Amino acid sequence: MNFAGFDRQQWFLAHRITAVFQVKQASRKANAEDWRARALARAKQATADLTQQGLLLALGFGERAWLPSADWQMYQQTNTAHLIAISGLHIGLAMGLGFMLVRLLQVFFPTRWIHPPLAQYGGLLMAGLYASLAGFSIPTARALLALSLLLAGQLGRRHYSPLQWLSLVVVGLALADPLIVLSSSFWLSAGAVLGLLLWYRYVPLSLLQFNGKPLWGVWRHLFGLLHLQIGLLIFFTPLQCYFFHGLAANGFVANLLAVPFYSFLLVPLVLFAVLSDGALWSWQVADGLAEFISRLLHLLNGSWLNLSIIQSLLLTAVLALFFGLLLCWIYSAKRMPPLLSVKSKGLSLSSQRSLPVNYRRELQWGITSLIVLCLSIAGWQHSQAANWRLMMFDVGQGLAMGLFKENRGLLFDTGGSWANGSMAQTEILPYLQRQGITIEQVILSHDDNDHAGGINAIFEAFPFAQFISPSYKAYTKVATTQRQLCQQGQRWQWLTADFSVLWPPQAVSRAKNADSCVVLVRLGDFQILLTGDADLSAEAAFSHAVPKLDVLQVGHHGSKTASSEQLIKQAQPKTALISSGRFNPWHFPHQTVLDRLSLHQADIYNSGWSGAVQVDFSDKMTVTLARDPLSPWFSSIIGLSAK
């Protein structure tokens, strides 16, 4: 558990995942397939030779297993991933499609058979059918329940304002599924709807007129789409920055092109192909359309911007200010010149526009409060960055330490890696991006995977950082000119911090535990010792040079092969940081080490229990834990018990 990035505990609980295991061997005992599995199998066979099979199956069944990771990343980085994941948008489209089909069929019915609710029931039935194709995943079930609540209210002749309807739906969903509040997709959906309700309340499409008349026909649809996307740009961007830590510069254009294409062409065609078993070459036509829009989005790819917390807050304040100025411009004068005109004819604002006094007060209070709040938090964040900060990341059974000041940083080890990822990608880089930190130096204690596994990911993100290592081992993303050897006696200064290397005496071809780079860091009056996995023999050689310490990074994850009595007695550390994985097979940290540290009155913090540990240095030293008494309740339960 770290201070930024993906919260696995929250995600597991929101998706009802109570255990994680690895299947080593499996065999099929029976073919107990339901109709969805059979439909998916037929669709897989029918689309086997199509270039966009992964996208078509994702749209038809909510299955992204066959979608290439590069395509999924493209949709994420163009702000259009919501078009692939079957959720409220798709279920709403299915309901609208079912409604229109029933209304069309009612043309052929006798008058006595035509009942207004029949089309609504047809829409709900189509929405339920689409949700079942998606396996009634949590987002689809949530959307279906929300539509059912709205339909029940309409049939019960309940008359509420749009905001009241939204409140009732949110409360109804929370009562039906209390854990829904842990789902980020729920808040994204609710936030998007709330933003659009506010947008249409204060800037309705009816404000626009063409040639002095309300918009109608194709003009109304075209400007309606543009109007919708502008509203989402203003209101949804802050939510996106909060949940995804960035945005796509071309996202507005991408959605402006892709949303109507998916809504009116691709999704209905894929639904028809699934339900008709690919009749009328529907799969082939859908593949051609999917190929076209994918190529179009590919041209817009590459504009993703990672934003820090401060940048996100400032952007939110700017958007709030823009919205306020837009409203002032719209409602400040009774008559204004046309926006787009040719010979006094064109697009203009309605002269009948007005903003009620109560709306005006709501806006003034809301916009001002939001701007002040964003600027205050941004100012506080900026002031905190001026102090030295030491971070022990929670990277499981590995080590990754960071030293930061004024948005500049140094890393000591990078955590482990596996076949298609690393702790650097999932835990370290998200934190650095959210804090707006640039890494200038990377010190590698030794070459074991649990310490060096993320080195290539770090240098891919920060290619100009200096690399300091006790070995000559080459790493793919590290240039030879960036390397500096870590050897006993070296000294250097970075910003106002002084670094002294206590071990090893010489570099080796591949550094192991005993060759760990041991660094003493002086931050004014504070002393920090970073030991990596240095063992007892190494400690015996350098411990005499260790001063009294404020912070000790306990060697080898708390193993009894390190942290000797000689070192602990010499250093007398006030704070001891242990990086270990919970329930690791070696049972680190060892009780002998814990007892030794306690005997010398050190405050002990283990990342396996406390999550990431943050130490701030100002006039005094302050320790903050990612998992503390103020953390959400599930952070203290999920994954913390061996039973």
Predicted regions and their residues:
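Transmembrane helix-bundle segments that form internal channels/tunnels in multi-pass membrane proteins
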Residues: 104-114, 118, 194-391, 404, ...
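Pre-active-site segment of Zn-dependent metallo-hydrolases
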Residues: 408-447, 534-548, 631-643
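Conserved beta-strand hairpin/beta-sheet module of binuclear metal-dependent hydrolase folds
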Residues: 268-271, 385-430, 434-435, 512-532
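Aromatic-rich juxtamembrane segments at the membrane interface
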Residues: 14-146, 152, 391, 492, ...
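Active-site HxH/HxHxD metal-binding segment of metal-dependent hydrolases
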Residues: 443, 447-487, 573
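Membrane-interfacial alpha-helical segments at the cytosolic side of multi-pass membrane proteins
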Residues: 89-110, 147-153, 193-203, 269-273, ...
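Active-site-proximal loop/helix segments of hydrolase catalytic cores
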Residues: 424-425, 445, 449, 453-458, ...
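Membrane-interface helix/helix-cap signal primarily in integral membrane proteins
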Residues: 1-82, 347, 422, 426-430, ...
